[in-house]
Amino acid sequence: MISDANTASSPATVAARFVDAITWGEHTVVWQLLSGSGRSVAVSVALANGLDRVVAARISDDVADPAEFDDFLRQLIRGLRRDLRSVDVSELQVGSCVVTGGVAVAHLTTPSVIPGTDDWAAGRLRLSMGGGGVWTIDRLEPIVAGP
C-alpha cells in the first residue's frame, strides 16, 4: 500500500517516520510502513501469541473487521515497544543508514546516560525498496538489554 506515510525518498526518512509512529502510537502508520514481509512477520508473531487464525487470515487478506484490525494494530505497537523495552522509545534516533542496492539497514541509537560517551546502539531496522521506489520496513532487530 502506498500512502503519504511511506513516499519519502530515503530509507533514513522512512526509518525515522517508523520510529516516530511507534513512539506516538500511530498504529496505522506503522502498518503502512511495513513491507509485505514485515506484515507477514507481524501476523505470524500475533498468531504465536494467541491471535485467532480466522482473524489472522482476514488481516492478511485485508478484509478484517475495522475493530479487530484496530485491536491487532494496537497489539502490534505494544509488541514493538516491548521489543524496545531496554531504551526510552521517545529518545530513539536513526543514526547511520547503509544502503546496498534495494536493501538498507538503519541503525537505531539512544543517548548515552554516561557523560562523555557516544550514543548507544538500540537496534536496527531492515528496509527494502518496493514497487515504485518506495522504501518499506521489513524487520526491527532490537538490541535487548535487561529483563
Where are the predicted features?
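Intrinsically disordered, low-complexity regions enriched in Ser/Pro/Gly/Gln/His and often acidic
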Residues: 17, 24, 65, 128-129
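Surface-exposed, charged secondary-structure patches
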Residues: 50-118
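Short secondary-structure boundary segments
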Residues: 1-10, 83-91, 98-99, 121-125, ...
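Amphipathic alpha-helical interaction segments
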Residues: 26, 39, 77-80, 143
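Short, low-complexity N-terminal intrinsically disordered segments enriched in polar/charged residues
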Residues: 1-45
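Generic preference for flexible, low-structure residues
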Residues: 34, 43-46, 50, 85, ...
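Short beta-strand edge/turn micro-motifs at domain boundaries
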Residues: 95-147
